[in-house]
From Swiss-Prot:
Keywords: Allosteric enzyme, Glycosyltransferase, GTP-binding, Magnesium, Nucleotide-binding, Transferase
Regulation of its function: Allosterically activated by GTP.
UniProt-annotated binding residues for 5-phospho-alpha-D-ribose 1-diphosphate: 79, 104, 131-139, 200
PANTHER family: ADENINE PHOSPHORIBOSYLTRANSFERASE, URACIL PHOSPHORIBOSYLTRANSFERASE, CHLOROPLASTIC
Name of the protein this chain belongs to: Uracil phosphoribosyltransferase
Its job: Catalyzes the conversion of uracil and 5-phospho-alpha-D-ribose 1-diphosphate (PRPP) to UMP and diphosphate.
Cofactor: Mg(2+)
Residues reported in the UniProt entry to bind uracil: 194, 199-201
EC number: 2.4.2.9
UniProt KW NAD keyword: no
Cofactor note: Binds 1 Mg(2+) ion per subunit. The magnesium is bound as Mg-PRPP.
Family assignment from sequence similarity: Belongs to the UPRTase family.
Length: 209
């Protein structure tokens, strides 16, 4: 598994703004989408293309390169992953959207599934799983379990912030999955939150804090 901590100055700047204690819901939501878009650019550099003929503006046929095959499904983990969805689909507007609903048991810190809806032909698609935080890794591994059980051959993960513990858990379960993140933070605290992290990203995106 490869872990890509993106070092682009715009990514660092926008993530830095997101860490401010008094950030508004509007600003946090906008920045989450913007960082997701920048990470998506990095994560999709190896998408396959194929040469295709199209009619050009002059009336002549042109040979261009377009994405090959069934392409991509984006998989936001509810609810916080929805805050990154627009950023991803801005770059890949033809992507189909699958949805996984998980919540964390606050005593065991393990994920509990409550909803799933996947697009068809998963065996022919790249799945991009999005969630603001990769903390313990439980929700991410549970989502990867669902995708792999349905025959999805290639999965990438995009998170705004990752903890070393979460990375290690994904790596142990699925060494073939690539992770793209704006930051690998220090650690998890006793409650399973990333330090320094972003706080509760779902609450900040939806204004329920």
């Amino acid at each position: 598994m490869s872990v890509h901590a993106i070092q682009h100055p715009l990514v660092k700047h926008k993530l830095g703004l997101m860490r401010e204690a008094g950030i508004s819901t509007k600003s946090f939501r906008e920045l989450a989408s913007e960082v997701a878009k920048l990470l998506t650019y990095e994560a999709t550099q190896d998408l396959e293309t194929q040469k295709t003929e199209i009619p050009g503006w002059s009336g002549e046929m042109l040979e261009v390169e377009l994405l090959k095959g069934k392409k991509v499904t984006v998989v936001p983990i509810l609810r916080a992953g929805l805050g990154m969805l627009d950023g991803v689909t801005d770059l890949i507007p033809s992507a189909r959207v699958s949805v996984v609903g998980l919540y964390r048991n606050e005593e065991t810190l393990e994920p509990v599934p409550y909803f799933e809806k996947f697009v068809g032909d998963l065996d022919e698609r790249l799945a991009i799983v999005i969630d603001p935080m990769l903390a313990t890794g439980g929700s991410m591994v549970a989502t990867l379990d669902m995708l792999k059980a349905r025959g999805c051959p290639l999965v990438k993960v995009i998170v705004l912030v990752a903890a070393p513990e979460g990375i290690a858990r994904v790596q142990e379960a699925y060494p073939d999955v690539e992770i793209y993140t704006a930051s690998i933070d220090e650690r998890l605290d006793e409650n399973g939150y990333i330090v320094p992290g972003l706080g509760d990203a779902g609450d900040k995106i939806f204004g329920t804090r």
